[in-house]
Curated annotation (Swiss-Prot):
Protein name: Eukaryotic translation initiation factor 6
Main location: cytoplasm
Gene from which this protein is expressed: EIF6
Lineage top rank: taxon: Eukaryota
UniProt xrefs under InterPro entries: eIF6
GO biological process: cytosolic ribosome assembly; ribosomal large subunit biogenesis
Stored Gene3D superfamilies: L-arginine/glycine Amidinotransferase, Chain A (3.75.10.10)
Length: 248
């Protein structure tokens, strides 16, 4: 299931939310409609938690996480940290980290097994990510950009990357993540996928400007539709055909 929504006047859904298989964070102090879209779809399965980070509403840019944990930057207050620990499942470890590159959501993209990280993250932060999220970490870039969290989105079934990512790089990313990878856009051609889309293994939320074709690609690569079938090569070919049709 893929749902379109908007935070106030912004289609950057991924800037104002963080979605995993164990919890969903939604920025505090915004539109009730934005929160309600997440709550109606997710509340029967995982907690949907209002929060800020360091008083900021751009929680998607500042955090990274999966079903094992949540990592927040040093600007997160003690009160915010305690609120998160009280609100999230006991199985989710919440960890604050001292890191110069504190927009962790822009610098890290991960599923429940692997994290791709900014090449300049500190070794201490990398170790905390491994421990808190229980993942393997790989330093890499996407389309020659180190902000991997801005230009890729991943769940345990697939990955979408910046539309100008070379095929060789996509093959390497697929090998690291052990999931199929496709290049695509969100919000009617926007290459900053991480800003406009959040996914877990059964749901996705994107901006209102996202086209039907873009949603089709999202639902196929992340395997959100129950009528999907066939093997991985067929899936990737269908995705390429869809993208070619969109560009034609």
């Amino acid at each position: 299931m893929t749902l379109r929504t908007r935070f106030e006047s912004s289609d950057d859904v991924g800037v104002f939310s963080r979605l995993t298989n164990a919890y969903c964070l939604v920025t505090a102090g915004g539109s009730q409609n934005f929160y309600s879209v997440f709550e109606q779809e997710l509340a029967n399965h995982i907690p949907v938690v209002y929060t800020s980070i360091g008083g900021s509403r751009v929680i998607g840019r500042l955090t990274c996480g999966n079903r094992h944990g949540l990592v927040v930057p040093s600007i997160a207050t003690d009160q915010e940290l305690q609120h998160l620990r009280n609100s999230l499942p006991d199985s989710v470890k919440v960890q604050r980290v001292e890191e110069r590159l504190n927009a962790l959501g822009n610098c890290v993209v991960c599923n429940d097994h692997v994290a791709l990280i900014h090449t300049d993250l500190s070794r201490e932060t990398e170790e905390i990510l491994r421990d808190t999220l229980q993942v393997q970490t790989f330093r890499t870039s996407i389309a020659e950009n180190a902000l991997v969290g801005s230009y890729a989105v991943v769940n345990n079934k697939g990955c979408m990357v910046h539309p100008k990512t070379p095929a060789q790089d996509m093959d390497e990313i697929a090998s690291l993540l052990q999931v199929p990878v496709v290049a695509g856009t969100i919000n009617r051609g926007n290459a900053a996928i991480g800003s406009g889309l959040v996914v877990n293994d059964w749901a996705a939320f994107c901006g209102l400007n996202t086209t039907a074709t873009e949603i089709t690609v999202v639902e196929r690569i992340f395997q959100l539709r129950r009528d999907l079938g066939g093997d991985e090569p067929n899936l990737l070919q269908q995705l390429r055909d869809t993208l070619v049709d969109e560009l034609a």
